[in-house]
Regions:
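Fe(II)/2-oxoglutarate oxygenase catalytic core
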Residues: 1-219, 223-253
């Protein structure tokens, strides 16, 4: 598949990227991938939702969002695109994010299939805003190697992003904005991964630790509101890398 990825991907935008220990890198790429078979409807497993108790704030998991084969494809795609230190268009304080990342726009068909699988389990309304029938096409994928971690933080809220109709530019959507983080684990402990749990806090107290599992997705509130969830990515203690993708769940403005 490597040759297919290389021929069906391109740099669609370049932004200033923040480095893990401080400083910036100009021209950090965001890629566009035209790979129609990234997710296939016939591969869809039967997902299951499990709520997480973190003191009344919204947090839940959906199991088996992707198959192992689909997760392996996503890992191969992102490795071919190339992980790097700089995160384009994202500002984090020095020392908060210690991992490598690649940001890309997934095909609209793949994101529509992903939304179809999770939509029945998502809140249909939050703070009076209705669930948008589309996920942001921008996927922020992270690779954690031994010793990497993401220290305590609250995720920011974002507009949605996709391609212009002619596919030549990245465009920012209007009329919709993110309210939920989706963390999609592409591998897990069953692959030999050690450490790297996502820990969730409420009022400074650890309330839950979510172990990475292939195909599992974790959801929680983000942005500048009292229901946003403080969380961290624990230190990876083994030699098997951890792969996780952040995807934004959108709600109408």
């Amino acid at each position: 598949m490597s040759d297919i990825i290389l021929h069906r991907s391109r740099v669609i935008a370049r932004l200033t990227g923040t480095l893990p220990e401080g400083g910036y890198e100009e021209g950090t790429p965001i890629h566009a991938v035209d790979f129609p078979d990234l997710l296939r409807a016939q591969d869809a497993p039967p997902p299951q939702r499990h709520d997480i108790d973190i003191g009344g704030k919204l947090a839940f998991m959906i199991e088996d969002v992707l198959t192992r084969a689909e997760c392996a494809r996503l890992i191969e795609v992102t490795e071919q695109l190339g992980f790097r230190d700089a995160a384009p268009g994202i500002n984090t304080p020095p020392g908060m994010r210690r991992n490598k990342t690649v940001h890309w726009l997934a095909p609209a068909a793949a994101m529509a299939e992903l939304f179809r699988r999770i939509a029945p389990f998502l809140p249909q309304e939050l703070d009076g805003r209705r669930l948008s029938p589309i996920l942001s096409h921008r996927i922020n994928t992270y690779r954690y190697d031994r010793g990497d971690e993401f220290n305590l933080h609250i995720d920011g809220d974002w507009p949605g992003f996709g391609l212009t109709p002619d596919g030549t530019r990245m465009t920012q959507w209007s009329g919709t904005h993110s309210m939920l983080t989706m963390l999609l684990y592409l591998n897990g402990a069953e692959d030999g991964l050690q450490g790297g749990a996502t820990t969730l806090y409420d009022k400074g107290e650890l309330r839950a630790a979510v172990t990475p599992r292939t195909g599992r997705a974790l959801f929680f509130r983000h942005g500048s509101n009292r229901d946003s969830v403080l969380h961290a990515g624990d230190t990876l203690t083994g030699d098997v890398p951890k792969y996780v993708a952040r995807i934004n769940v959108m709600y109408d403005v």
